[in-house]
C-alpha cells in the first residue's frame, strides 16, 4: 500500500491490474502524470469515497474528466445509512445485487455536474429520493444523486461509499465491492486472471 505514486515508474505501475484508491487521489504533479499515463493506457482503478473529491483548488482537469463528474457540491453530515437503488442489473457490477438495499452509515458526496448527464458515464447505483432531507449539520435536500458509476472510456468504477469501517461490513455492499474489483480486473488488457 502507498499514499503516493512517487518512486514508481510507468513500467512498474503497468504490471498492476488495478489501483484501489481508498479516500485519496494523486496530489503531486509526478504522481498525477503517472496515473494519467497508466489509465490512458488501459490501467484499472477502483475509487472509494474521497478518492473522487475535487474542488476549485484541485486544479486537475484531466481527473475531473476521468471521474465524469464536476467539482464537489454538497454532502450529508454526519454519516448515516441510506437507501440505494440499482439503476441497471445489466452490468456485471450490479447483476446479482438486490433492486435496493440500505447502505451502512456514510458521508455521501454530491457533485456540481451530475454524472448521469455525462454521455461517457454509466450510473449503476443511485441514492434514493426517499432519503431526503439527508443529514443534520450538513443537509442534502434533493437532486439526482448517483453513488456508483463507471466512465465508459476507462477501466474504472467509482464508489461513493467508504467513509468509515461500517461501509465494508454490509453483505450487499461487500458483494458490490467484490463485483467491481472482479469486473475491473477481468477487463485487463493482459487477460482475465479469473479465467485461468
Q: What are these model-predicted stretches?
A:
Residues 1-17, 181, 189-191, 195-196:
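Aromatic-Pro/Gly-enriched surface loop or interdomain linker
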Residues 1-2, 17-22, 39, 44-49, ...:
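Structural recognition of the beta-strand scaffold that forms the well-ordered cores
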Residues 3-8, 30-33, 140-147:
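Alpha-helical scaffolding within the catalytic cores
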Residues 4-6, 24-27, 129-130:
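Short beta->alpha connector loops
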Residues 25-99:
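A glycine-rich, often tryptophan-bearing local segment used as a flexible ligand/cofactor-contacting loop or short
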Residues 77-153:
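Catalytic beta-strand/loop cores that center a nucleophilic Ser/Cys/Thr
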Residues 130-147, 151-196:
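Extracellular ligand-binding/catalytic regions of CAZymes and related secreted enzymes
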Amino acid at each position: 500500500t502507498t499514499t503516493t505514486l512517487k518512486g514508481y515508474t510507468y513500467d512498474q505501475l503497468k504490471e498492476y491490474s488495478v489501483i484501489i484508491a481508498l479516500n485519496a487521489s494523486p496530489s503531486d504533479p509526478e504522481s498525477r502524470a503517472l496515473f494519467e499515463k497508466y489509465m490512458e493506457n488501459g490501467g484499472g482503478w477502483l475509487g472509494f469515497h474521497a478518492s473522487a473529491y475535487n474542488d476549485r483548488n484541485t486544479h486537475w482537469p484531466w481527473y475531473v474528466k476521468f471521474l465524469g463528474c464536476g467539482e464537489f457540491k454538497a454532502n450529508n453530515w454526519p454519516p448515516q445509512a441510506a437507501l440505494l437503488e440499482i439503476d441497471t442489473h445489466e452490468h456485471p457490477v450490479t447483476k446479482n445485487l438486490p433492486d435496493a438495499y440500505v447502505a451502512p452509515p456514510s458521508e455521501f458526496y454530491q457533485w456540481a455536474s451530475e454524472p448521469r448527464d455525462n454521455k461517457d458515464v454509466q450510473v449503476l447505483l443511485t441514492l434514493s429520493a426517499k432519503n431526503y432531507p439527508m443529514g443534520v449539520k450538513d443537509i442534502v435536500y434533493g437532486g439526482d444523486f448517483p453513488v456508483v458509476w463507471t466512465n465508459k472510456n476507462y477501466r474504472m468504477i467509482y464508489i461513493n461509499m467508504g467513509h468509515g469501517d461500517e461501509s465494508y461490513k454490509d453483505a450487499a455492499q461487500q458483494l458490490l465491492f467484490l463485483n467491481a474489483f472482479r469486473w475491473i480486473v477481468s477487463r485487463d488488457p493482459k487477460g482475465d486472471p479469473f479465467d485461468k
